[in-house]
Every structure is written in structure tokens, then in C-alpha cells.
Amino acid sequence: MPERGAVAYIGGGMPAEKAVLTAELRLDVQEFYARYAECLDGGRLQQWPEFFLEACVYRITTRRNLRLGPDQDLVSLSSRTAMFDRIVAIGQSEDYEPHMQRHTVSGFRIQAASGQELRAQANFQILRTFPEQRSEHFVSGSYNDRIAVAAGRLHFREKICVLDSDVAPTSLVYPI
């Protein structure tokens, strides 16, 4: 039986005693996702890598390519340094039209908890708006994440963005 103030989240055959998370931690993780989306929506790309551990994995793939393995990823970065390099490249690129993104994150759930790591999943939808044009649906999919919990701070250890469509977007510049 969970302690008063704790909520049990059980998934994937995980034993109940390992699935007990405090409501406060769950709210912290939801806030972490909200701040992640806010950072990207606000165009603060220089801050994006700060959501990750130094040794991390960031991938964007399709549902089909996820089954085929990392070699088929649309984007694959293996460190925070690689993320900063990508941000610099975006700033220097002249091959894309600047635009805004607006993330909607929903269906958030913690799938597993062990030690100082959580496995979480959430759905996302991103709208894209070019200057003087209407907003359009850009991509949708799910985040499949491993989140490190240490010293009261959360960081992504692994973030896999799985696009619903097997057809890759024509322009995948900004982080998802």
C-alpha cells in the first residue's frame, strides 16, 4: 500500500513496490516537460542542451525506423556537445526559413522507476508558423525518455522522439 501522498504508477510488468512515486515527483516531471516545450517554443535554442546530461542520447526517428535501429534515425546526437554544435549550425545555416514552433505535450505517464532513473512517455504535436503565413501541423508522435533524477534535478539521459508518420518532414531543423 503506498504511503499517504504517494501515487502508484504501474506499467510493463513492473513490481508495485518499484512503481510507487510521490505525487510531487510526478508533478516535477510534468513541469520538466512543460519547461522543455517552453524553451523550444520560445526559440531559446542555446538553453536546449541544458535539459540533458553531458553523456546523453537524442534521437528523432519514425515508428518504422525505430524497429530498424538507430542507423535509420533522422537525427542522432550522442552528447550535449553535439547538441551545442547543432545549435551553432542552425544559427549559421541559410538553407531554411526561420519559423516558430508550438508544442503540445499530452498523455504524459511514468512507465518505470528504478534508483535514480525514470522511464517516461508523452505524446507531442508541433505546429509550425512561418512569418506572415497560417500555422500548420508539422509533426506528431511520442517522446520515449529516460530521465536522470539527482540532487533534486531532472535531466534527460535519453530522448527518443518517435514520429507517427513514416514520411519524414521536409525540413527538420529545430529540435523536437
Give, region by region, the residue ranges found by the protein language model:
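Short, low-complexity N-terminal intrinsically disordered segments enriched in polar/charged residues
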Residues: P2-G42, Q46, E50-E54, T61
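A beta-strand edge to alpha-helix "cap/lid" segment located at domain peripheries
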Residues: Y9-G12, R102-T104, R109-I176
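Conserved aromatic-histidine-acidic binding/catalytic patches
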Residues: L21-E24, D71, S135
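A generic "alpha-helical surface" signal
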Residues: L27-E31, L74, T81, F138
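Hydrophobic pocket/interface hotspot
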Residues: Y36, W48, M83, A120, ...
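Short helix-to-loop capping/linker segments positioned immediately adjacent to catalytic or ligand/cofactor-binding
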Residues: Y36-E38, G91-P98, P131-R134
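A solvent-exposed, acidic/Ser-Thr-rich amphipathic alpha-helical stretch
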Residues: E54-N123
